[in-house]
Amino acid sequence: MRWRPVACVVLGVTAVVCSVIAATAPPSPPPAPPPAVSSSEASFHSVRSYADVAEPVRLRIPALGVDAPLTHLGVAPNGTIEVPADFAVPGWFDQGPRPGQPGPAVILGHVDSKAGPAVFYRLNRLPVGAVVFVDRADGSTVDFRVRGTQHVAKTAFPTDLVYAPTLEPSLRLVTCGGPFDHSRSSYLDNVIVYADP
């Protein structure tokens, strides 16, 4: 599976994504997994031709007041996923699908910094049904509706739910959350938002 090796590094990277202020909220149940796909459906969709979509350039989450440009995130020389250099700018993992292409497009953002709240500070409060817009370089926009938020210990990161291929477009927003471990300067949990068109 193409995404599994890269996805496994998320556990190490999420410590870098987070900084100082803990934002806590009661845990919510994980969203339902995507529907199972029979091998005949997978065969049909795997040969289906999907139109190429332009690169994502901006993320808008009206329910949170987020309206920010997107940066590209790749794989660092040590094999981990890069993290956004700017705490106010989320990053799209450009080794995965573009938002609107089949599969899970993944966008990472910081929860906070030593200076205060960052772009995904209130991500854990994003309600089911909220709309997330991704603007693309060609002027088009793809919108996703939140279907669930998962709070999970970094040691139990759900790699398959976040990165496993899907037949339809989907979006994952990932940040840190939960208790802050001062000895490691890292949050202990991840907040993952699952959204579909």
Q: Over which residues does each language-model region extend?
A:
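Solvent-exposed, non-transmembrane regions of membrane-associated and secreted proteins
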Residues: 12-128, 133-140, 145-197
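N-terminal export and membrane-targeting signals
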Residues: 1-13
